[in-house]
Design a protein with these regions (language model features):
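Core, highly hydrophobic multi-pass alpha-helical transmembrane subunits of bioenergetic inner membranes
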Residues: 1-290
Length: 290
């Protein structure tokens, strides 16, 4: 356990350091190198958990990192293969149709891995727009983003068996939002969006890690849950949703409608959970349990 903590601290330092280096890289090759080093820096986080499922999670993460890396470098080397770069980045961010690996990695790992995948590793989206030449590449990103929102909107009700499942849905939805916005918005505005997301996501992951495994949350945790996740006047969630919603609306109306559907589905699910706290889980419906 002590060795795992030391490895995780080392991985955290490398993860933050290489992510910062993305912003000072002066060519595409160095950008790709720092991006992959940041991804590999997450591997020590897996060793905090000794459960057998961690090996499946780690294997899936390494395979996806390798495949996406190959696609990205192929797109960077050959202009005619730019679509492969876009596909590689979509795979790395877990957008439709590449959402499955995100669930395998997050569900069978620990909350430190969940935090790393959900926050720091998302910083590379700020450079997504620089690789797009417009036309079909931008359309592909918007289509995949819109379909991601629609599928996640249903997944909240069909595939949520705990808080880590819920956050996997929410994180993929946020990834789709960030990637879609990177196509149209200015780098300055994207940086503000990411800083807001980084703070909000870190707070949510910290809270959900405390709630995980608790059948009936404490009253204080419920208030924090409402403040961070339920969109009502004065909550942090409503500011985040409005900010992101306005940004997505300025990008594409169709994608915005998909995001609205996903957000409404998420809010109704959370409200149903809060109303059902203390009610026997068999009364919630089939397949929905915490």
């Amino acid at each position: 356990m002590f060795r795992g903590v030391l490895l995780s601290i080392f991985g955290l330092v490398c993860l933050v350091g290489f992510s910062i280096c993305l912003f000072v890289s002066d060519n595409l090759l160095m950008f790709w190198l720092f991006l992959e080093l940041a991804s590999l820096s997450l591997i020590p986080f897996f060793f905090l958990d000794s459960e057998s499922g961690v090996l499946v999670s780690l294997f899936s993460y390494v395979v996806v990192s390798g495949v996406s890396s190959s696609l990205v470098v192929s797109g960077l080397m050959f202009d005619d293969l730019l679509t492969l770069l876009v596909i590689g980045l979509l795979l790395k961010f877990g957008l439709f149709p590449f959402m499955g690996w995100v669930y395998v990695v997050l569900i069978y790992s620990n909350w430190l891995v969940v935090w790393g995948v959900s926050t720091i590793l998302k910083s590379s989206f700020l450079f997504f727009g620089f690789f797009l030449s417009g036309g079909w590449d931008s359309v592909l990103v918007e289509v995949c983003g819109g379909l991601t929102f629609i599928f996640i909107g249903f997944f909240f009700w069909l595939y949520t068996y705990g808080w880590v499942y819920y956050w996997s849905h929410a994180m993929i939805s946020s990834s789709a939002s960030l990637v879609v916005m990177s196509v149209e918005l200015s780098p300055d505005l994207l940086l503000y969006v990411f800083m807001f997301y980084l703070f909000w996501a870190s707070m949510v992951v910290m809270l959900l890690s405390r709630l995980d495994g608790s059948r009936v949350p404490r009253l204080g945790y419920i208030f924090l849950l409402i403040f961070l996740l339920i969109s009502f006047p004065g909550s942090l969630s409503i500011f985040y949703k409005l900010f992101v919603g306005l940004c997505i609306y300025s990008c594409s109306l169709i994608v915005f409608l998909g995001w609205v559907f996903c957000s409404i589905s998420e809010q109704f699910y959370l409200i149903k959970y809060l109303v059902g706290v203390g009610v026997p889980r068999t009364e919630w419906g089939v397949g929905i349990t915490f």
